[in-house]
Design a protein with these regions (language model features):
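ATP-binding/phosphotransfer module of carbohydrate and carboxylate kinases, centering on a glycine-rich
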Residues: 1-103
Length: 103
């Protein structure tokens, strides 16, 4: 839908809302984790491809790192969803209980 109908006002408005919210979430993660880069796959890669400047601007604008530069936001180069799923599965315990993962 993003690739074929992004020029339509309703599709574009919905995508921009999603991009802005994704950017806010990523900025929060940047502030907490201080990564050297962000790699987006799946649906998130599609949002990055739809409007990379907007997403990168939101992350830079809302993150502390944005004050001195910005963290690179890059598309995932893995085309196999199973590999991406395996990587997400490895992170699930951290997402479920972040404090326990630090112990």
């Amino acid at each position: 839908l993003l690739r074929t109908r992004y020029a339509e006002p309703a599709v574009r408005a919905a995508a921009e809302t999603l991009i802005d919210r994704l950017g806010l979430g990523l900025a929060g993660l940047v502030n907490i984790l201080n990564p050297d880069r962000i790699i987006l796959g799946g649906l998130h890669r599609g949002l990055l491809a739809a409007d990379p400047e907007r997403l990168r601007a939101v992350v830079a604008e809302r993150s502390l790192w944005g004050q001195s530069g910005s963290v690179p936001v890059l598309p995932c180069t893995l085309d196999h969803d199973s590999l991406v799923g395996a990587a997400e599965l490895a992170w699930q315990p951290v997402l479920d209980d972040p404090l326990a993962a630090l112990r």
